[in-house]
């Protein structure tokens, strides 16, 4: 059984709402240094900077350019699709134990960085801080829940008898 994050509810229960708001405000402030940064495409683990970019603006204040992202060419798009297919094939052969471990590691990392990630969600989607934190808490909870589900159901792989002995 997972223990839900419930960041805001915990802040209320421990009378630490001010600390919650200070952490969120601090995360917002630290992100301002990243505004307008140009990000690369990442295809097959390699960073590729494109000639053309587009701006991502905050919906709550469209004057703020949060980031610049590359416009992929047709060739880069095909490279990305092929890379994703290869990654899917690799992930498909990954044991359920390794998948569950990965889910938990991501959940732990998200939990450690929750105020920064929630601030990003708020800026990028225009959500208020409580909605953004709730979304992040839910993501962390789902990652942990599905890790538990994978393990309790042994990866959802059930070997059954075949009707025909030659059937695989």
Residue ranges and their predicted role:
Residues 1-61, 65-66:
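Hydrophobic face of amphipathic alpha-helices that form TPR/SEL1-like repeat modules
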Residues 49, 130, 159:
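Short, electropositive, low-hydrophobicity segments enriched in small/polar residues
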Residues 49-51, 64, 74-77, 165-167:
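Residues in flexible loops and secondary-structure boundaries
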Residues 57, 61-154:
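Glycine-rich loop-to-alpha-helix module at the N-terminal edge of alpha/beta enzyme cores
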Residues 156-168:
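Conserved small-residue-rich beta-alpha loop and adjacent elements
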């Amino acid at each position: 059984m997972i223990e839900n994050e419930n960041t805001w509810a915990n802040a209320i229960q421990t009378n630490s709402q001010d600390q919650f708001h200070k952490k969120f405000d601090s995360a917002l402030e630290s992100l301002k240094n990243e505004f307008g940064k140009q990000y690369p495409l990442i295809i097959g683990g390699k960073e590729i900077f494109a000639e053309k970019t587009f701006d991502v603006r905050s919906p709550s204040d469209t004057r703020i350019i949060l980031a610049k992202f590359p416009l992929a060419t047709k060739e880069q798009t095909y490279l990305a699709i092929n890379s994703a297919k290869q990654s899917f094939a690799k992930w498909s052969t990954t044991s359920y134990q390794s998948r569950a471990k990965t889910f938990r590691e991501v959940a732990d990392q998200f939990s450690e960085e929750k105020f920064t990630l929630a601030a990003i969600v708020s800026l990028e989607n225009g959500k208020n801080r409580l909605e953004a934190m709730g979304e992040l808490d839910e993501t962390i909870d789902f990652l942990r829940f599905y890790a538990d589900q994978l393990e309790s159901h042994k990866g959802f792989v059930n070997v059954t008898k075949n009707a025909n002995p030659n059937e695989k």
